[in-house]
């Protein structure tokens, strides 16, 4: 239950240790001045997908680093973020995220590095 995610209309469809799926249905409030999905929305999807995937192990995480490559624009319909865990360690989890539209066009690709706040209490081995 994260107010910022609810505010943006992001829906968490599936959460898993290896893969998670989130989506948002485009609406006017999420557009940039040119009628396309705002870059901040795509970045939020990448960051959120990385975070929920990291937290699937039951621990608390914050974003340590994130990068994104914007590849194509989207103007309407559903935008989906699909994450895949690259590495899950004791203190750091790295997640790759692809953002696609309804036609499966790749809109953005990002990598999120998540830092575990409660790593000292964890039994996860790096």
Could you tell me what each predicted segment is?
Residues 1-126:
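Terminal targeting signals and extreme-terminal segments of soluble enzymes
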């Amino acid at each position: 239950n994260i107010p910022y995610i609810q505010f943006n209309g992001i829906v968490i469809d599936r959460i898993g240790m290896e893969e998670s799926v989130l989506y948002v249905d485009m609406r006017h409030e999420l557009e940039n001045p040119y009628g396309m999905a705002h870059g901040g929305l795509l970045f939020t999807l990448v960051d959120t997908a990385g975070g929920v995937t990291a937290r699937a192990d039951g621990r608390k995480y914050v974003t340590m680093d994130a990068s994104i490559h914007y590849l194509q624009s989207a103007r309407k319909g559903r935008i989906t973020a699909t994450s895949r865990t690259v590495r899950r360690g004791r203190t750091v989890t790295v997640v790759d995220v692809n953002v696609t539209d309804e036609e499966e066009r790749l809109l953005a690709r990002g990598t999120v590095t998540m830092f575990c706040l409660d790593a000292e209490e964890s039994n996860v081995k790096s």
